[in-house]
Every structure is written in C-alpha cells, then in structure tokens.
Amino acid sequence: AMGADKLGLSDEELREIVNSWRKASPHIKQLWYDVDAAALEAVRECRAVTLHHGVVFSYRKGILFLRLPSGRRLAYVRPKIEIEPEFDREGLTYEGSEQTSGKWTRLRTYGGKLVENIVQAIARDCLAAAMTRLEAEGYQIVMHIHDEVVIECPADACDLGNVCRIMGRSIDWAPGLILTADGYITD
C-alpha cells in the first residue's frame, strides 16, 4: 500500500516495518481506535461523541458529521454499522464517490482512515487561515498546493520573512499548535 510494493520488499518485511512503526507510535494507534469507537457510537446511539481538541462526531438525519476544531464539518452520508468479515468486528460504511471510478457506492472506513481525514482537513483549515491573513495583508495568492502558497508580487515588495511570520501566527481555534513556515523567492 501507498507505494510500498515498489520498494522490492516482501510482504513479511512490510508487515515487520508496519508493526515496528505501530509499536513505536502507541498514541497514534490508540487514536485510531478512539476515533473508530467514537464514530460507531455516534451512529449507534444517534448522539454527539466528543474526542480530543474539539473533534466531535454527531449523527443527524442520516448523516454522520465530524466537526473539526475549526468548526468546519465533514459529512459521511447514510452511515451504517456492518460486520467486517475479514476482521469479524463491527465497522462503519457510508455512501460516497469511489476514488478511482467516481461511481457513487457504499464505502468502508475505519479509525485510521478517519484520522487521516481529520489530519488532512485540519491541515487544510490551517492553510486557509494563513491564506486569509496573507490576503488581508495585501499579498496576492495565485495558487496553493497542499501546504504551500504561491504569491506573486513585485520584487521590491516581497518580504519573505513577513510572509513566513504571517503564515506561522497562531490560530484561535488551535491554541498551542506551533506553526512555522519557510519559503523562497524566484523570478
């Protein structure tokens, strides 16, 4: 998975790497289980379940909502709790677009995948906050890619240090989150 098949490692070697990483990262592994349990509980009991740092799962009118610390919500349509035959345990499915075909279908998710959604969504919200601040300071953003912004400005008006300071400012909804930025100027 995720390109590991191109490394020329055997399945056993890959399993060993994964197991070593999980053993070295017990808090992340526990977060996967906590998030999985919270999502299942929200669907099963049709109620809000609060996790750490303002992450809340809630179920309403056939939609599982995941509220992020920023207040933005992700939505999982028509969630169901089903038995995962390969693991012989309850798992969560929802309706959405299949990633490769774009076909609307029932998709399976789990704690690790939900944590990935949370992390990527929070990173997006951090970038959006930085972009809003940059634009308020008069910088013209011409595009952004993942966690980067491209700013177009006259050479005598570009202050890379100021751009990095603006991007690294704390965010109201993420107290204690340390943000830094780096960059370069090109013609």
Show where each model-derived region lies.
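Conserved catalytic core of nucleotide polymerization and phosphodiester-bond processing enzymes
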Residues: 1-187
